[in-house]
């Protein structure tokens, strides 16, 4: 997951705010936020949540990855020779519309070589096109799990067609997608554009966590930002959309660096526990696959990203979860 600001770089290679100054700013920010929300008449629980979120950014915000749009992290714009199809013709109860976001393993970092053959489409920049391997709109230009999953969904009869909207960004932390992160705007703008085009998401797939394991977020801190992200998504997709939170934290420790050695791989059970605890079937939030278990270290092509074999397994693992969480088309707010 190389980038100008690579969260797999050693701590000595990153700028840090002096501890006391950062703490002072964080305390001041918390106090100001508490006064503001109290004055606004928000419930005590919301005041507490806002304070917790502010504390996470006060502690980790200076180490938030900087997401670039160049090199291996450039957004794939799609094959210019692939003709666009009528997006309006895809809308309907027999089409799954799935928003995908998170970090690199939800983007286009899988080994190349899979060509979707059934009615599987992507939406990017207002255009719908047939999907072959990589999905336009996500970072990198290799292969994708989602083209594989799309074929499986159509083959199963769960839906007649699948439209993926993939905005995953390699190297991103949940902090980037949270209230104070630069990718929040991308998330909100994408959902707004889908609404304007009459493409209400039926599903949302979130796969992310490796960056935050490296950054050292605690389970409680991760849960605080995840709750904020899920709340934002729910407010924009409506109550009928199924939201899936994958479990993911495993990464190759760059201090060790030997991708052939299992001892060089680290995971964060507390982050995985926070991802699992986010599930609430009563509100249509479900657990996705646990890729820490599903994709072991030897099935990662560069120490981080899924091999084609792992992507096949990841796609297959979604199917029983989707059947359990099957939904009708919701109404966007």
Predicted regions located by residue number:
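N-terminal intrinsically disordered, acidic low-complexity segments at the extreme N-terminus
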Residues: 1-10
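Prokaryotic Sec-type signal peptides and long signal-anchor helices
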Residues: 9-12, 20, 40, 209
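N-terminal Sec-pathway targeting helices
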Residues: 13-32
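Cell-envelope and extracellular/periplasmic
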Residues: 25, 38-333
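Hydrophobic core
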Residues: 31-39
């Amino acid at each position: 997951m190389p980038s100008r600001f690579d969260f797999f770089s050693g701590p000595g290679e990153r700028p840090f705010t002096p501890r006391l100054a950062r703490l002072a700013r964080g305390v001041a920010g918390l106090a100001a936020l508490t006064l503001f929300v109290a004055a606004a008449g928000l419930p005590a629980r919301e005041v507490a949540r806002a304070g917790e979120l502010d504390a996470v950014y006060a502690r980790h915000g200076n180490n938030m990855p900087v997401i670039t749009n160049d090199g291996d992290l450039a957004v794939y714009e799609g094959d210019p020779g692939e003709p666009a199809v009528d997006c309006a013709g895809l809308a309907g109860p027999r089409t799954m519309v799935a928003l995908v976001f998170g970090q690199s393993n939800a983007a286009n970092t899988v080994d190349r070589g899979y060509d979707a053959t059934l009615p599987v489409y992507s939406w990017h920049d207002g255009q719908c096109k047939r999907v072959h391997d990589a999905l336009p709109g996500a970072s990198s230009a290799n292969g994708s799990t989602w083209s594989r999953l799309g074929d499986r969904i159509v083959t199963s009869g769960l839906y007649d067609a699948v439209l993926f909207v993939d905005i995953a960004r390699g190297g991103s932390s949940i902090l980037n997608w949270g209230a104070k992160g630069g990718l929040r705007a991308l998330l909100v703008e994408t959902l707004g554009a889908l609404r304007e085009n009459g493409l209400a998401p039926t599903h949302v797939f979130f796969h992310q966590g490796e960056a935050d394991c490296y950054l050292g977020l605690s389970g409680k801190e991760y849960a605080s930002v995840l709750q904020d992200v899920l709340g934002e998504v729910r407010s924009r997709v409506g109550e009928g959309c199924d939201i899936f939170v994958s479990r993911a934290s495993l990464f190759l420790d760059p201090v060790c660096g030997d991708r052939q050695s299992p001892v060089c791989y680290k995971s964060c059970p507390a982050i995985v526990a926070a991802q699992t605890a986010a599930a609430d079937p009563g509100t249509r939030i479900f657990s996705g696959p646990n890729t820490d278990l599903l994709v072991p270290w030897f099935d990662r092509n560069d120490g981080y990203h899924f091999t084609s074999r792992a992507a096949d397994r990841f796609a297959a693992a979604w199917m029983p979860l989707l059947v359990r969480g099957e939904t009708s088309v919701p109404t966007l707010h």
